[in-house]
Amino acid sequence: PPRSTLFPYTTLFRSGELKEEEISWWQDLWYEGMGEFRYLNGLLGVSKESWVSFSYKKESEKKLHDFSKLSGNLIAFTGGKDSSLSLSILKDEIPESETFSINPPENIEKIRNFFGFGDRPSIIISRKMGYFILSANEKGALNGHTPFSAIVAMIGMFVASLRDKKYVIVSNEGSADEETVFGTGINHQYSKSLIFEKKFREYCNLVWENGPEYFSLLRPLTEIGIFKMFKKYEDILPEISSCNKKEKQGTWCGKCGKCLFAFLVFSAVWDIKFAKKITGKDMLSDTGNLNLLKELAGVSPT
């Protein structure tokens, strides 16, 4: 990659030995997981082998956790519509279920209470972006999506081992398997895809035996199907946001692709009046959203 990125060229593991299959897995994750980054920054010609390398230094051998007493579910909960739907589906298994959240919205307990999880453990994880990344962006460093959902998966497996939970449940749906860059096979949400899920499960089986199992509960569903299932949960919808910029406050910026997409589906499943009520915006009347609309419709580059 060009030197205008902060992405590391090599990563050194200091505990234990890396098998060839593990090295291949990590290379695959960071190459495929940054597919949109490579596309947007003109780096599609860079090979997987030269994108990043992994090595190890066997300084210590770590003893793995005892997985003989695993039971119950650990649910990744963001406070958004997808993970909220998972709570609604799993509410009857509450005694065996806990949630974990990374930088959750301020109203997350209100949503958990609505779905009957108020008296169940909630593990809160704080994650901060390094200041040098933000300053590098301001100076023109290349930017783009990273495989964040893979980070969520790893954190989930770690927390599950600490909490002795058998299943790590996420809420990735079917559209993560559809390419967003025509003819390339690239989806910016690679680490939400079924192929990643399968490879991650294979990786976990490679490095430990009988550990927690990772899977997505909503894989068979489409986006519009998820919205339709929320018909019976309209009372909580004003508390749920899918906006990356305003999700912390549980509101909508009305200027990003996620906001506009949600507005369109709210309009399709309910009506445009309902979409305005939930988001507090009239996004289709905002001419500043025209390019976003073209991207969502597939008539301009992502």
Regions found by a protein language model. Give the residues of each.
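RNA-binding accessory domains that recognize and position tRNA/RNA substrates
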Residues: 6-73, 84, 89-130, 138-141, ...
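Short, well-ordered junction/capping motifs at the entry into regular secondary structure
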Residues: 1-3
